[in-house]
Amino acid sequence: MEKIASFTIDHTKLKRGVYVSRQDKVAGNVITTFDLRLKEPNNEPALDGAASHTIEHIGATFLRNHKTWADRTIYFGPMGCQTGFYLILAGDWKAKDIVPLMQEMFAYVAQFTGTIPGESAVECGNFRFMDLIQAKEEAGKYFTEVLDNIAEKNLSYPS
């Protein structure tokens, strides 16, 4: 089998950031998959599963209700390695194009109060697996240390 595109990225050089992971054509339309890397692979502890699950619920709800991006949002969810999230948007986008959206979303998660969207047995298959406090900490850290004044090195995969 051929190696998938994400395995061709040198994860020993990968920093936290916002990256275009791939672009595909579906029925003649471009979709862009983004790598939202919250943790430096193999150098930082991975995201806590419950925190990641909470960010997924709040982030997906935010995106699907966003006045500009709702109709372009296809998917938002955690990476299996627990170092970040994938965001799939309809359209031909560059990483810098979505930085304002990511700043808005991660600030929203960091300041979130109230009931976590989908936090019930009826709405989620593992609704007790949530940690709002840690989710807010991780979102705030990503916003402050990466998204706010993001550098070019955090927008392009290492060569």
From Swiss-Prot:
EC number: 4.4.1.21
KW Lyase (keyword) present: yes
Subunit structure and binding partners: Homodimer.
Listed GO MF terms: iron ion binding; S-ribosylhomocysteine lyase activity
Protein's UniProt name: S-ribosylhomocysteine lyase
InterPro entries: LuxS_sf (IPR037005), Metalloenz_LuxS/M16 (IPR011249), S-ribosylhomocysteinase (IPR003815)
Cofactor note: Binds 1 Fe cation per subunit.
Binding residues annotated for Fe cation, in chain numbering: 53, 57, 124
Lyase in keyword set: yes
Key words of the record: Autoinducer synthesis, Iron, Lyase, Metal-binding, Quorum sensing
Gene3D superfamilies: S-ribosylhomocysteinase (LuxS)
Family: Belongs to the LuxS family.
PANTHER family, alphabetized: S-RIBOSYLHOMOCYSTEINE LYASE (PTHR35799:SF1)
Main function: Involved in the synthesis of autoinducer 2 (AI-2) which is secreted by bacteria and is used to communicate both the cell density and the metabolic potential of the environment. The regulation of gene expression in response to changes in cell density is called quorum sensing. Catalyzes the transformation of S-ribosylhomocysteine (RHC) to homocysteine (HC) and 4,5-dihydroxy-2,3-pentadione (DPD).
Gene label: luxS
Gene Ontology terms describing biological process: quorum sensing
Domain of life: Bacteria
Top EC group: lyase
Cofactor(s) demanded: Fe cation
Catalysis performed (reactions): S-(5-deoxy-D-ribos-5-yl)-L-homocysteine = (S)-4,5-dihydroxypentane-2,3-dione + L-homocysteine
